[in-house]
């Protein structure tokens, strides 16, 4: 029998992970990962072992007021493999606006995740995506970023 409650809890975990990435909430993001988590972002181009190493990379890569991101994970295919483990496949859509480089990046990919229940709570043990496509466009003078939650006033 499919355990829909556990699947919904895993969906909430992935949604929280994406929100934490986009809001640069590194404490909340760390809480989504097991201590020994592994990441393989962008077809393995950015691979890290250990929660702290993953968070350090993302902070270095993303935590600046001149960059904003939007990551959406949807169409989940989640399989509960035991009482404490699960696997998931997700579609990814992302947008990155980088004002320093004057570009907008848009892309899609497929996430492959593994989950582990730790002290009764689902955590991400392995996460990573393979790109379907990525396009980069130079930002025109006609396009203005008018709201940015990270900009210093």
How would you name each of these model-derived features?
Residues 27, 31-92:
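A solvent-exposed, acidic/Ser-Thr-rich amphipathic alpha-helical stretch
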Residues 5, 46-49, 103:
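A structural signal for alpha-helical segments
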Residues 63-153:
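A beta-strand edge to alpha-helix "cap/lid" segment located at domain peripheries
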Residues 1-31, 35:
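Short, low-complexity N-terminal intrinsically disordered segments enriched in polar/charged residues
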């Amino acid at each position: 029998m499919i355990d829909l409650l556990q699947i919904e809890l895993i969906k909430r975990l992935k949604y929280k992970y994406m929100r934490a990435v986009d809001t640069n909430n590194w404490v909340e993001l760390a809480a989504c990962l097991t201590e020994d988590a592994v990441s393989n972002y962008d077809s393995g181009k950015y691979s890290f072992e250990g929660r702290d190493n993953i968070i350090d990379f993302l902070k270095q890569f993303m935590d600046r007021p001149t960059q904003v991101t939007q990551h959406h994970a949807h169409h989940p295919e989640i399989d509960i493999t035991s009482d404490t483990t699960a696997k998931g496949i997700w579609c990814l859509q992302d947008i990155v606006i980088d004002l320093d480089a004057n570009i907008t990046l848009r892309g899609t990919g497929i996430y492959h995740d593994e989950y582990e229940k730790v002290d009764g709570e689902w955590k991400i043990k392995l996460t990573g995506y393979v790109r379907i496509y990525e396009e980069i466009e130079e930002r025109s003078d006609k396009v203005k970023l008018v709201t940015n939650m990270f900009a210093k006033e």
